[in-house]
């Protein structure tokens, strides 16, 4: 996920509070002390978590020589880029060189452009403003998933009982809405969008903070393009909440429940690539249709179309790698 940093030079308590309350990734300040008094957040400062000029470098681009210097630095270290005459061209060149670029922005339009340049965008933005509401707006925009997820239509081919086993409920510290859930799959190259427990039913009250995600072995997509095993999740971990329209946001795990339950195997295809998932056999477990509505696994049948994500390559310790790996 993209990150938002806030410039607190000179010191501005209201901006610092806005950064903390909005979930900004960090701040840059002349001293870490005043920030620490308000709360815990990553601080870029001479006495902070990241030291300017050592862990991170600030570069002002005023000419082609500055741009060349920034492009070289972006290949090996994290840089904060100031562009007095803000245009998108220097950022395109920098983004093409690496994932270490934080762009200084002063309004929401600049932030949106920086985060989407070359479709990839910079890794983060440093908000330079005296308006706490602008900080909140940019944080909301980033957390709502400005880049989103490309979802695919999966045609169901098989739905059948899969015996008993341990399944995982992921309880987050966020409330999800209809159409939202998590991307989960049996393999690292195929995921189903498993719907959150937001719907009213005769059996149990809604649990909009929960996704009954599947077997302990399954992969879950988490931030930064990585995956995690459901069995490895714990309180405090960060996960991705994905909507059927492709938008996504991060959430914090509050609790993980692993219980033995009857299971279903669901198999599907997308452009000749097979994907599968093992879910609990219960009416309250749902996948997401292309119209963002939910369909229970107990009423799912071959030919039904649901949403998911299909990828190529494999995974090593959750990181995507360009390697031939056979999973089935």
From Swiss-Prot:
GO terms assigned for molecular function: 3-dehydroquinate synthase activity; dehydroquinate synthase activity; NAD binding
GO biological process terms held by the UniProt record: amino acid biosynthetic process; aromatic amino acid family biosynthetic process
Catalytic activity: 2-amino-2,3,7-trideoxy-D-lyxo-hept-6-ulosonate + NAD(+) + H2O = 3-dehydroquinate + NH4(+) + NADH + H(+)
Top-level class of the enzyme under EC nomenclature: oxidoreductase
InterPro entries, per the entry: DHQ_synth (IPR002812)
Assigned keywords, A-Z: Amino-acid biosynthesis, Aromatic amino acid biosynthesis, NAD, Oxidoreductase
Domain of life of the native organism: Archaea
Assigned EC number: 1.4.1.24
Keyword Nucleotide-binding annotated: no
Disulfide bond positions: none
Pfam families the UniProt entry points to: DHQS
Family: Belongs to the archaeal-type DHQ synthase family.
Function: Catalyzes the oxidative deamination and cyclization of 2-amino-3,7-dideoxy-D-threo-hept-6-ulosonic acid (ADH) to yield 3-dehydroquinate (DHQ), which is fed into the canonical shikimic pathway of aromatic amino acid biosynthesis.
HAMAP family for this protein: Arch_DHQ_synthase (MF_01244)
Protein name: 3-dehydroquinate synthase
């Amino acid at each position: 996920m993209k990150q938002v940093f806030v410039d607190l030079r000179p010191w501005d308590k209201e901006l610092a509070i806005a950064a903390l309350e909005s979930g900004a990734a960090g701040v840059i300040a002349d001293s870490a002390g005043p920030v620490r008094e308000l709360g815990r957040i990553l601080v870029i400062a001479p006495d902070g978590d990241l030291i300017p000029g050592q862990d991170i470098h600030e570069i002002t681009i005023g000419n082609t020589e500055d741009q060349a210097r920034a492009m070289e630095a972006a290949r090996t270290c994290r840089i904060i880029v100031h562009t007095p005459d803000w245009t998108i061209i220097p950022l395109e060149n920098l983004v093409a060189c690496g994932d270490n670029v934080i762009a200084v922005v002063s309004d929401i339009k600049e932030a949106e452009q920086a985060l989407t340049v070359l479709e990839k965008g910079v890794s983060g933005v440093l908000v330079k403003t005296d308006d706490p509401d602008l900080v909140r707006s940019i944080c909301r925009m980033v957390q709502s998933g400005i880049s989103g997820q490309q979802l695919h239509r999966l045609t169901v081919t098989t739905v059948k009982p899969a015996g008993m086993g341990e399944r995982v409920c992921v309880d987050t510290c966020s409330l999800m809405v209809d159409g939202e859930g998590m991307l989960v799959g049996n393999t690292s190259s195929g995921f189903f969008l498993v719907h959150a427990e937001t719907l009213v039913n005769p059996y149990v009250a809604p649990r909009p903070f929960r996704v009954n995600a599947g077997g302990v072995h399954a992969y879950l997509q988490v931030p930064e393009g990585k995956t995690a095993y459901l069995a490895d999740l714990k309180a405090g971990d960060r996960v991705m909440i994905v909507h059927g329209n492709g938008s996504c946001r991060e959430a914090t795990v509050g609790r993980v429940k692993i219980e033995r339950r009857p299971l279903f195997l669901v198999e599907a295809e997308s452009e000749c690539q097979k994907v599968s998932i093992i879910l609990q056999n219960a009416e309250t477990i749902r996948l997401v249709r292309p119209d963002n509505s939910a369909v229970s696994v107990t009423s799912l049948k071959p030919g039904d179309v649901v949403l998911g994500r299909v990828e190529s390559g494999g995974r090593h310790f959750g990181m995507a790698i360009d390697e031939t790996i056979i999973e089935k």
